[in-house]
Regions:
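Short, active-site-adjacent cap segments at secondary-structure transitions
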Residues: 125-128
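Beta-strand elements within well-structured catalytic alpha/beta cores of enzymes
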Residues: 62-66, 114-122
């Protein structure tokens, strides 16, 4: 009888952690009220869990991308890397296309770096509810649903088209996510996406995703 051999994934990349994080200041204990933070408990719990995972991965460098220069960096780092003492490289995204940021992510990867953690900061649609910051637009929930669906399928091609497919979604994270995907692609990392949490109690989509490596 032939013995079954269990195959284990071998990661030859120097990327040891990668995640998508939302960045609403309201989830910070110093900003959000206890009542508001209860409404985003799933998001907070998910980020705290990934913070423990990042610590165990022992990265020497963090590359974080964000469309905002203040809370866009500070909120994810509070939960994911509060005690991190290594190098943090911040990458600010602008208005160029998601595909351009995907290519930029490829160029940003440096194989000579040792142990890298990637964080893509960004919120999903801001128009999920009538009482949300931009009211309701049907593009909002469609964008969020398709982004999650394509992430699960590792369908980068369609992810990079989402800004054109749903132009009224009022999202702020797609270019940041595209940058992370470009770095992952260039690194050769063997990654498997997991949606850790998703919710939108205030009319804005908050996604926490773990790219298992």
């Amino acid at each position: 009888m032939r013995r079954k051999i269990k195959l284990h994934r071998i990661n030859m990349s120097n990327v040891v952690f990668a995640a998508i994080s939302p960045h609403p200041p309201i989830i910070l204990p110093s900003v959000g009220s206890e009542e508001d933070r209860k409404k985003v408990k799933n998001t907070i719990d998910a980020l705290q869990s990934l913070g423990e995972k990042l610590k165990k991965a022992r990265p020497e460098k963090i590359i974080i991308s964000s469309p905002h220069s203040d809370w866009g960096f500070n909120v994810p780092l509070f939960f994911l890397a509060q005690d991190f003492e290594g190098e943090i490289k911040k990458h600010l995204t602008g208005l160029e296309s998601p595909d351009e940021y995907f290519q930029e992510g490829k160029k940003a990867y440096n194989k000579t770096d040792k142990r890298i953690a990637l964080i893509a900061s960004g919120d999903l649609s801001h128009c999920l509810k009538e009482d949300g910051p931009y009211g309701f637009n049907p593009d909002g929930p469609k964008f969020d649903g398709d982004l999650i669906k394509f992430l699960k399928k590792k369908d980068i091609k369609n992810i990079l088209k989402l800004d054109r497919t749903y132009p009224q979604a009022a999202e702020c994270g797609l270019r940041s996510f595209s940058f992370l995907l470009g770095v992952l692609e260039a690194s050769g990392a063997n990654w498997q996406p997991e949606i850790v949490s998703y919710e939108g109690p205030f009319g804005v989509g908050y996604l926490v995703a773990d790219f298992k490596i």
